[in-house]
Amino acid sequence: MNVGVAHSEVNPNTRVMSSRGIWLAYVISVAALHVILLSIPFFSIPVVWTLTNVIHNLVMYLLLHTVKGTPFETPDQGKDRLLTHWEQIDYGMQCTSSRKFLSISPVVLYLLTSFYIKYDPAHFMINTASLLSVLLPKLPQFHGVRVFGINKY
């Protein structure tokens, strides 16, 4: 271990999801969100599951697919300033373990939500739209694509 030595990453965003414990922290934060919503007395169980799913997907979309660039001064001469955080993860390589985890977790939450809402049509449509809005940008075909020019600059 090199104490006092700076990291060797040009862009620290590329390896953050591969850090030790980040997946556990992610699961714990989703569970904490669900427990907090459950503690609100006037929410029914289907509403809590739908809110958990929608809030999770909204936060995931905002943090991974709208935030661009890096929060650090990096020596990459601005190569990553037009890339979203999702496009920077694992240096843009597709099908890595971090990308698989971040793609599968909304699906697992969607399946749990669908089960606990007992496939109520209104909740089901909201949850399906929420899932599609967060899964479609993760597809390899959309790497670097800005639909309708949204988030282009």
UniProtKB/Swiss-Prot annotation:
GO terms for cellular component: endoplasmic reticulum; endoplasmic reticulum membrane; serine palmitoyltransferase complex. Pfam families: ORMDL. Keywords: Endoplasmic reticulum, Membrane, Transmembrane, Transmembrane helix. Residues 1-21, 64-105 are cytoplasmic. InterPro entries: ORMDL. The keyword Coiled coil does not apply. It comes from the Eukaryota. Residues 127-153 are extracellular. It is a multi-pass membrane protein. The keyword Membrane applies. One of its GO terms (biological process) is intracellular sphingolipid homeostasis. The chain crosses the membrane at residues 22-42, 43-63, 106-126. It is found in: Endoplasmic reticulum membrane. Ceramides bind to ORMDL3 N-terminus and stabilize it in a conformation that physically restricts the accessibility of the substrates to their binding sites in the serine palmitoyltransferase (SPT) complex, hence inhibiting SPT catalytic activity. In the absence of ceramides, the N-terminus is flexible and permits substrate binding, thus liberating SPT from inhibition. Ceramide-sensitive subunit of the serine palmitoyltransferase (SPT) complex, which is also composed of SPTLC1, SPTLC2/3 and SPTSSA/B. Belongs to the ORM family. Plays an essential role in the homeostatic regulation of sphingolipid de novo biosynthesis by modulating the activity of the serine palmitoyltransferase (SPT) in response to ceramide levels. When complexed to SPT, the binding of ceramides to its N-terminus stabilizes a conformation that block SPT substrate entry, hence preventing SPT catalytic activity. Through this mechanism, maintains ceramide levels at sufficient concentrations for the production of complex sphingolipids, but which prevents the accumulation of ceramides to levels that trigger apoptosis. This is ORM1-like protein 2. It comes from Gallus gallus. The gene is ORMDL2.
